[in-house]
UniProtKB/Swiss-Prot annotation:
Belongs to the universal ribosomal protein uS10 family. One of its GO terms (biological process) is translation. This is Small ribosomal subunit protein uS10. The keyword Ribonucleoprotein applies. The lineage of its organism: Bacteria, Pseudomonadati, Pseudomonadota, Betaproteobacteria, Burkholderiales. Keywords: Ribonucleoprotein, Ribosomal protein. Disulfide bonds: none annotated. It comes from Polaromonas naphthalenivorans (strain CJ2).
Length: 104
């Protein structure tokens, strides 16, 4: 039995609206070219928290708390055609979205 080729796309961004818009654009492009798309699956949001001293000298108890959230989405394109790969390469995504593509 031959194994099917699969493209795994992982998106990361700080803004969830931007990542959902990009995921919808990728799904639409892949479906238009006749590929089967599984996803987008929302992965757990990673939160990094930082404590920063407000005062440069004294008042150690006075601090600011900052956090940055990294949203992630995962999708698989099963049995892609050459047309699908070309369309995905030509796709223009916003600057705030990090895209990782693996061919399996």
């Amino acid at each position: 039995m031959a194994t099917k080729q699969k493209i795994r796309i992982r998106l990361k961004a700080f803004d969830y609206k931007l990542i959902d818009q990009s995921a919808a654009e990728i799904v639409d492009t892949a479906k238009r070219t006749g590929a089967i798309v599984k996803g987008p699956v929302p992965l757990p949001t990673r939160m990094k928290r930082f404590d920063i001293l407000r005062s440069p000298h004294v008042n150690k108890t006075s601090r600011d708390q900052l956090e940055i959230r990294t949203h992630q989405r995962l999708m698989d394109i099963v049995d892609p055609t050459d047309k699908t790969v070309d369309a995905l390469m030509k796709l223009d995504l916003p600057a705030g979205v990090d895209v990782e593509i693996k061919l399996q």
